């Protein structure tokens, strides 16, 4: 089998039609040489729909508090609109893409996170469905909606989801696409390399804040559990250029 990479696409890139189109074109080229699992979130689209439906939501340490109404909107946006838009874009580039959520076939089972509502923390990956898709040369496009042991939907952070899948499938590389040039220092300059041992310090001294916290924690966890290379890159610069921050052991 070709070497596997896991790519996480999300943030405001999901609302940038031009950037998304270019990204999918690049991904189609990469898919000729490597197996790919594409994981996506879509926070801005979820926020847009929540505002449209006059539903309030809040964030706790970069993670969205998810009540029943928020969960319903999140599942609609992630498993529906965003997932199928990405699949359509890949199909147009002659990639055999299949859109699923992490809930399908109980691919990722989570435990509910305290104080965050219907938010899940992955505890088990069932690889069968995704393995079948990869073996048959399909590119899985996976929305960040998972489930608990009783098949109840849970909103799972897409960075965390990408990390656990990269670990489970022993990915050669994990790439997080963002709308910034990687992790920035206090002078807004890109930190080109971060050692895992320094991650907690960078969070404590507030160099890393907000939505970048779960992202960098996912990077560190992936490296600790065997993924060789993890990148946080500027999606606007493209996957091939790899402009951003690399996290290493």
How does the language model describe each region?
Residues 1-249:
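C-terminal catalytic "cap/lid" subdomain
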